[in-house]
UniProtKB/Swiss-Prot annotation:
<dbReference type="GO" id="GO:0015074">
    <property type="term" value="P:DNA integration"/>
</dbReference>
<dbReference type="InterPro" id="IPR006118">
    <property type="entry name" value="Recombinase_CS"/>
</dbReference>
<protein>
    <recommendedName>
        <fullName>DNA-invertase</fullName>
    </recommendedName>
</protein>
<comment type="function">
    <text>A DNA fragment of approximately 900 base pairs, adjacent to the fljB (H2) gene, which specifies the synthesis of phase-2 flagellin, can exist in either orientation with respect to fljB. The orientation of the inversion region controls expression of fljB. The hin gene occupies about two-thirds of the inversion region; it is required for the inversion of the fljB controlling region.</text>
</comment>
<comment type="similarity">
    <text>Belongs to the site-specific recombinase resolvase family.</text>
</comment>
<feature type="DNA-binding region" description="H-T-H motif">
    <location>
        <begin position="162"/>
        <end position="181"/>
    </location>
</feature>
<dbReference type="InterPro" id="IPR006119">
    <property type="entry name" value="Resolv_N"/>
</dbReference>
<feature type="domain" description="Resolvase/invertase-type recombinase catalytic">
    <location>
        <begin position="2"/>
        <end position="135"/>
    </location>
</feature>
<dbReference type="Pfam" id="PF00239">
    <property type="entry name" value="Resolvase"/>
</dbReference>
<keyword id="KW-0233">DNA recombination</keyword>
<dbReference type="InterPro" id="IPR009057">
    <property type="entry name" value="Homeodomain-like_sf"/>
</dbReference>
<dbReference type="InterPro" id="IPR006120">
    <property type="entry name" value="Resolvase_HTH_dom"/>
</dbReference>
<dbReference type="Pfam" id="PF02796">
    <property type="entry name" value="HTH_7"/>
</dbReference>
<dbReference type="GO" id="GO:0003677">
    <property type="term" value="F:DNA binding"/>
</dbReference>
<dbReference type="InterPro" id="IPR036162">
    <property type="entry name" value="Resolvase-like_N_sf"/>
</dbReference>
<keyword id="KW-0230">DNA invertase</keyword>
<dbReference type="InterPro" id="IPR050639">
    <property type="entry name" value="SSR_resolvase"/>
</dbReference>
């Protein structure tokens, strides 16, 4: 059961000593760090720390905002730790998910994020139902309509190159192959 520390400062110029001293005092076995904004999703130090964390271990940060800026991301990260059987501890915020009170606080904190996810799903389903009621189907609009499909089919059968047709119809060559696989095109002999 290791204690893994994570330090993050927003710029290279910021001093990490305060965080490092706090994590050292918390008896962290290993400390990982990033010198990057919390808004940036790709944080190599955090990735290494999360890879290092095993079941029964605890990820420790000096302050909650060092781990992430949005509640949604924090909830996802702490949930991932929980699913792996690991714990989370924020020193200055007094959050420790290894205790009943810490887990309770985490659940209270995660409730708004869960509600937001459910509201998004409800709005999406309501929008799709309204569209269906008006005769529209959900999803992306087709890249080419039926009339264009018929035109392209005739042109392909006459031997026109896909690259040329892609330019004319303003679509990608891969779209042409998706709609008209090479095995289905019969070239007419004139």
């Amino acid at each position: 059961m290791a204690t893994i520390g994570y330090i993050r400062v927003s710029t290279i110029d910021q001093n990490i000593d305060l965080q490092r001293n706090a994590l050292t005092s918390a008896n962290c076995d290993r400390i990982f760090e990033d010198r990057i904004s919390g808004k940036i999703a790709n944080r190599p130090g955090l990735k290494r720390a999360l890879k290092y964390v095993n079941k029964g271990d605890t990820l420790v940060v000096w302050k909650l905002d060092r781990l992430g800026r949005s509640v949604k991301n924090l909830v996802a990260l702490i949930s991932e730790l929980h699913e792996r059987g690991a714990h989370f501890h924020s020193l200055t915020d007094s959050i420790d998910t290894s205790s009943a009170m810490g887990r309770f606080f985490f659940h209270v904190m995660s409730a708004p994020a869960e509600m937001e996810r459910e509201l998004i799903v409800e709005r999406t389903l309501a929008g799709l139902a309204a569209a269906r009621a008006q005769g529209r189907l959900g999803g992306h609009p087709r890249a080419i309509n039926r009339h264009e499909q018929e035109q392209i089919s005739r042109l392909l059968e006459k031997g026109h190159p896909r690259q040329q047709l892609a330019i004319i119809f303003g679509i990608g060559v891969s779209t042409l192959y998706r709609y008209f696989p090479a095995s289905r095109i019969k070239k007419r002999m004139n």
